[in-house]
Amino acid sequence: MSSFSKEARQVHEALVKHGLENPFNMDPENGLLDAATRRSHIEKHITQIMELLNLDLRDDSLSKTPSRIASMYVDEIFLGLDYAHFPEITLIQNKMQVDEMITVHDISLSSTCEHHFASIDGKATVAYIPKDYIIGLSKINRVVQFFSQRPQVQERLTQQIILALQTLLATENVAVSIDATHYCVKARGICDRSSVTRTTSLRGLFKSSQNTRQEFLHIC
């Protein structure tokens, strides 16, 4: 059983309420198998897939591949499926009465397309206008990273980040923009090696105020 922090539970419940949570097969707090069991099952199935591809797992270059993939899935690229790994969030009272835009841009993100399990590489720009609280800047990067470490579609990823920050910061005034290269487009199918997909979500003043919106979009 995973153990959620209060902040993780609040974010998860907000995503469920708004229909933005990933399509989990069961409740992620009570239904998730422990990491060792998941690694064992995944390793077994990857072995079967490789054998169906006529690969000889006795070769020393391939023999540990199923184990490596299992560890990569559970402990690295899909770590965000387990809310036990939601970043620890420390809110700071806005004693300085900051009321201007705070922006973090060029946040590196790596995710995985849920349709083909191909890589997604991109950068995010996140901004918010504080009310009662501000948040450590690295926590914004960590929230982006957490939701990126899942099988994703970029549209949902953008909405998850913005709703998580709205929930944590208790403010509507949040904006998120992501530019990403999708290897399901670049390396297969159409094989377009230059296109970049942009998704943007604007809330609160970022949507209602033309000046605030233009300032954010200019940064992007």
From Swiss-Prot:
One of its GO terms (biological process) is one-carbon metabolic process. One of its GO terms (molecular function) is zinc ion binding. It catalyses: GTP + H2O = 7,8-dihydroneopterin 3'-triphosphate + formate + H(+). One of its GO terms (cellular component) is cytoplasm. PROSITE patterns: GTP_CYCLOHYDROL_1_2. Gene3D superfamilies: 1.10.286.10, 3.30.1130.10. Pathway: Cofactor biosynthesis; 7,8-dihydroneopterin triphosphate biosynthesis; 7,8-dihydroneopterin triphosphate from GTP: step 1/1. Its EC number is 3.5.4.16. Keywords: GTP-binding, Hydrolase, Metal-binding, Nucleotide-binding, One-carbon metabolism, Zinc. Zn(2+) binds at C113, H116, C184. Homomer. Belongs to the GTP cyclohydrolase I family. NCBIfam families: folE (TIGR00063), PRK09347.1-1 (NF006824), PRK09347.1-3 (NF006826). This is GTP cyclohydrolase 1. It comes from Hamiltonella defensa subsp. Acyrthosiphon pisum (strain 5AT).
